[in-house]
């Protein structure tokens, strides 16, 4: 059913550059340069979309997405002077400039004769008096949240020049019960915490779920029947299979960028080394060969290199090697130990967990190890995962005490840290690519 809904959505969601919705070719004055570091959020007015409760819900989700990014400051609707009733009419720009709304979003949601929703919006530069963007979409009513996320992505991209990340999903480990008898299941949700549902229902420990590049399957580790194994799970059908029936423990799986291989750590003869498995031929290739623990591999976005953690030097550090295992080079040299590295989708940074001074931090560094920056520090922060635009990270935090872990997001400035709502405790998040 999920596959049918998505295919139907893909077929019927139509972006129209026409019918009066074409954006002005003039250069907009409203821009956000997110490469400058910590920027002042842009004041933006997002009106209630016209016609019905669902229309208002869509505009509310758009506002929430943009606000959570830290780059936009939606203006309180109580300050609006003009009450928009006709989205096709030119706004009264003076009314919006008075409240310092530098950008304005108006829209309309209507129901077609065949039951589909038609959602349309316009983005205006109020000080230049020009339309920056106009689009419309057709979809089924149950997909209204996706439409809201897609519109938020379009606004984000038009103003920042960067791809958005709102139309994405998070797979994670949902945790419940007391700390000494915690139950763990795989779960999936929208990036803002909505539409959460369980993917597994056993009492076996599950860890490190990771999306495939095509978003249709995940790989994860499970201790089913007390045997740690790496599995592939098809999201649409719920079918799963073991990735190789190895005699030792397998863990920390992750897909290659082309989705043709899984890279993982395999323990044999007391040592844990990095292996890849071709998902078609089921052949394995050993990439590291040490007496240490090599684990948590992550490919560069072009698939040419791999970052991983190893204690071959005495404590956990980060190393980079070629995708064939060649040129293994240590890149972390700061105080403390480093773990859970993951390469940015942009290729410019590697995120990691750092343990130092009794605390755990989430940070980033360049692939050569330079430019290390700590974004957040706490009692126990771990497991960073990148948004598909490479501008935001999600991780999990465990505070001292009897409580459980929670998910947080943080941007690369380190200033915009947000709690991600989940149903109960949550750990080990993994961010999907943009949906299609």
Swiss-Prot record:
Localization in the cell: Periplasm
Database matches in SUPFAM superfamilies: TolB, N-terminal domain (SSF52964), Tricorn protease N-terminal domain (SSF69304)
GO CC entries: periplasmic space
Top-level taxon: Bacteria
Annotated GO biological process: cell division; protein import
InterPro entries: 6-blade_b-propeller_TolB-like, PD40, Tol-Pal_TolB, TolB_N
Assigned keywords, A-Z: Cell cycle, Cell division, Periplasm, Signal
Complexes and interactors: The Tol-Pal system is composed of five core proteins: the inner membrane proteins TolA, TolQ and TolR, the periplasmic protein TolB and the outer membrane protein Pal. They form a network linking the inner and outer membranes and the peptidoglycan layer.
Chain's role: Part of the Tol-Pal system, which plays a role in outer membrane invagination during cell division and is important for maintaining outer membrane integrity.
Family per similarity comment: Belongs to the TolB family.
Name under which the protein is recorded: Tol-Pal system protein TolB
Organism: Sinorhizobium medicae (strain WSM419)
